[in-house]
């Protein structure tokens, strides 16, 4: 499909990733890191998905705007994304909020996070800008979205999901005509507009926008001069373009990278503990909807130098094994069992311990005889010998962060308070 053009449009584009959000609904999991820096899938970080999509789509100029507790995010990107080469017209810029426009002003909104760095963007002279949220899990070819943008002559093209209307109230929702030209855009409406010909479904914004660079610069400068603006794409920029220009919807089904043709598209907002937990466990399915084994569309991340995973002991009641689980490098499962779980790098499980439906972040240690069910362990947690979680809801709720569905988040501080 790409040979329609003499060269991919992605070569003329710059991806700009908005990665400054806290993600407060993830509770203590984001106390010390921004949401895009949260671990996912056994070895990656959430931001790796947007960045990998950009690289795999052919985009070689990338900027990442950071703000809230950005140290771990910046450190990760410096280690994992340092392979871009200026001599090949490639660039990777990390852009922390730094009062570049005003000494009293940090990033005030998503649009402002782009506006404050217009001079840096201009230095690369991209023809198109692809604005991305850095906190979603999905695979997508942005080149196909760029192509629709150019062919439609739109001022902005918005990536969108087809979702049931009853589920669309938490999104920015678009009303469209039969050609997918956007006629209205409303943030989190109580009564979302339906899709023509399929009124039970709605088009929800993915937080992905494609602009011609000149148009984007002009509208951001105009917005910056408006004292009533909240400096936000969803609240201010997009509704204004819908009223006064041409906005087009790009359906995710047209550019998603599927695990297989017969498998539905996969996109997840992992903004709550339950959503984060379930998206991780999705990867333990026999045929997961999100294919992390696809060498044609890999998820790039930091390649830590570490030993392979190891399973030891083979006795009745003390057999090191994992079933329907993802076990990362440097893990040791010593006479323990993991069922439908993800063990990130460097996890150690002591003899006679078990975990079932568990998301265990890097360098955790699970003591002998501990039993864990439906848990998220923050990185570096040391579970005491014999601790049981997931069998007594009232006790779990007093000691840990427990969701309504029974998922328990456990942090170092919570374990310290048990003593």
UniProtKB/Swiss-Prot annotation:
<feature type="binding site">
    <location>
        <begin position="187"/>
        <end position="188"/>
    </location>
    <ligand>
        <name>alpha-D-glucose 1-phosphate</name>
    </ligand>
</feature>
<dbReference type="Pfam" id="PF00483">
    <property type="entry name" value="NTP_transferase"/>
</dbReference>
<dbReference type="GO" id="GO:0008878">
    <property type="term" value="F:glucose-1-phosphate adenylyltransferase activity"/>
</dbReference>
<keyword id="KW-0547">Nucleotide-binding</keyword>
<dbReference type="InterPro" id="IPR029044">
    <property type="entry name" value="Nucleotide-diphossugar_trans"/>
</dbReference>
<dbReference type="InterPro" id="IPR011004">
    <property type="entry name" value="Trimer_LpxA-like_sf"/>
</dbReference>
<dbReference type="InterPro" id="IPR005836">
    <property type="entry name" value="ADP_Glu_pyroP_CS"/>
</dbReference>
<dbReference type="GO" id="GO:0005978">
    <property type="term" value="P:glycogen biosynthetic process"/>
</dbReference>
<dbReference type="GO" id="GO:0005524">
    <property type="term" value="F:ATP binding"/>
</dbReference>
<comment type="function">
    <text>Involved in the biosynthesis of ADP-glucose, a building block required for the elongation reactions to produce glycogen. Catalyzes the reaction between ATP and alpha-D-glucose 1-phosphate (G1P) to produce pyrophosphate and ADP-Glc.</text>
</comment>
<keyword id="KW-0067">ATP-binding</keyword>
<keyword id="KW-0808">Transferase</keyword>
<feature type="binding site">
    <location>
        <position position="107"/>
    </location>
    <ligand>
        <name>alpha-D-glucose 1-phosphate</name>
    </ligand>
</feature>
<keyword id="KW-0320">Glycogen biosynthesis</keyword>
<dbReference type="InterPro" id="IPR023049">
    <property type="entry name" value="GlgC_bac"/>
</dbReference>
<dbReference type="Pfam" id="PF24894">
    <property type="entry name" value="Hexapep_GlmU"/>
</dbReference>
<dbReference type="InterPro" id="IPR005835">
    <property type="entry name" value="NTP_transferase_dom"/>
</dbReference>
<keyword id="KW-0548">Nucleotidyltransferase</keyword>
<feature type="binding site">
    <location>
        <position position="205"/>
    </location>
    <ligand>
        <name>alpha-D-glucose 1-phosphate</name>
    </ligand>
</feature>
<feature type="binding site">
    <location>
        <position position="172"/>
    </location>
    <ligand>
        <name>alpha-D-glucose 1-phosphate</name>
    </ligand>
</feature>
<keyword id="KW-0321">Glycogen metabolism</keyword>
<dbReference type="InterPro" id="IPR056818">
    <property type="entry name" value="GlmU/GlgC-like_hexapep"/>
</dbReference>
<comment type="pathway">
    <text>Glycan biosynthesis; glycogen biosynthesis.</text>
</comment>
<dbReference type="InterPro" id="IPR011831">
    <property type="entry name" value="ADP-Glc_PPase"/>
</dbReference>
<keyword id="KW-0119">Carbohydrate metabolism</keyword>
<comment type="similarity">
    <text>Belongs to the bacterial/plant glucose-1-phosphate adenylyltransferase family.</text>
</comment>
<protein>
    <recommendedName>
        <fullName>Glucose-1-phosphate adenylyltransferase</fullName>
        <ecNumber>2.7.7.27</ecNumber>
    </recommendedName>
</protein>
<comment type="subunit">
    <text>Homotetramer.</text>
</comment>
């Amino acid at each position: 499909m790409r040979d329609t053009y003499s060269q991919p449009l992605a070569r003329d584009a710059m991806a700009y990733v908005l990665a400054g959000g806290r993600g407060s609904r993830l509770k203590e999991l984001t106390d010390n890191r921004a949401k895009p820096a949260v671990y996912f899938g056994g070895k990656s970080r959430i931001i790796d998905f947007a960045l990998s999509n950009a690289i795999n789509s052919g985009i070689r100029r990338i900027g990442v705007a950071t703000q809230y507790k950005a140290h771990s995010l910046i450190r990760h990107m410096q280690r994992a994304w340092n392979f871009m080469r200026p001599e090949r017209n490639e660039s990777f810029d990390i852009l922390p909020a730094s009062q570049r426009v005003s000494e009293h002003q940090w990033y005030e909104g998503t649009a402002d996070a782009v506006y404050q760095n217009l001079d840096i963007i201009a230095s690369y002279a991209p023809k198109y800008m692809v604005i991305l949220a850095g906190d979603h899990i999905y695979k997508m070819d942005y080149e196909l979205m760029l192509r629709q943008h150019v062919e439609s002559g739109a001022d902005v093209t918005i990536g969108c999901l087809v979702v049931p209307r009853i589920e669309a109230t938490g999104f920015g929702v678009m009303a469209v005509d039969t050609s997918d030209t956007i006629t209205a855009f409303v943030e989190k409406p109580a009564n979302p507009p339906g899709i023509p010909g399929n009124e039970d479904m709605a088009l929800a914004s993915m937080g992905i926008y494609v602009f011609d660079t000149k148009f984007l610069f002009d509208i951001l400068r105009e917005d910056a001069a408006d004292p009533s603006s909240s400096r936000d794409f969803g609240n201010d920029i997009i509704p204004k373009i819908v009223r006064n220009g041409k906005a087009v919807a790009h359906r995710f089904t047209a550019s998603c990278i599927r695990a297989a043709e017969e498998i539905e598209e996969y996109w997840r907002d992992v903004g709550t503990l339950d959503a984060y937990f379930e998206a991780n466990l999705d990867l333990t399915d026999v045929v997961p909807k999100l294919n992390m084994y696809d060498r044609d569309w890999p998820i790039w991340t930091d390649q830590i130098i570490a030993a392979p995973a190891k399973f030891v002991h083979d006795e009745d009641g003390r057999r090191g094994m994992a079933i329907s689980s993802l076990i990362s490098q440097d893990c040791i499962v010593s006479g323990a069992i993991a069922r439908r779980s993800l063990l990130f790098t460097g996890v150690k499980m002591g003899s006679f311990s078990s975990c079932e439906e568990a998301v265990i972040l890097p360098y955790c240690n699970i003591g002998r005889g501990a039993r864990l069910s439906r848990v998220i362990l923050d990185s570096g947690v040391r579970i005491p010998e014999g601790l049981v979680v997931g069998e007594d809801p009232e006790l779990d709720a007093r000691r840990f962060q427990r969701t309504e569905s029974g998922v328990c988040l456990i942090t170092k501080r919570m374990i310290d308070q048990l003593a």
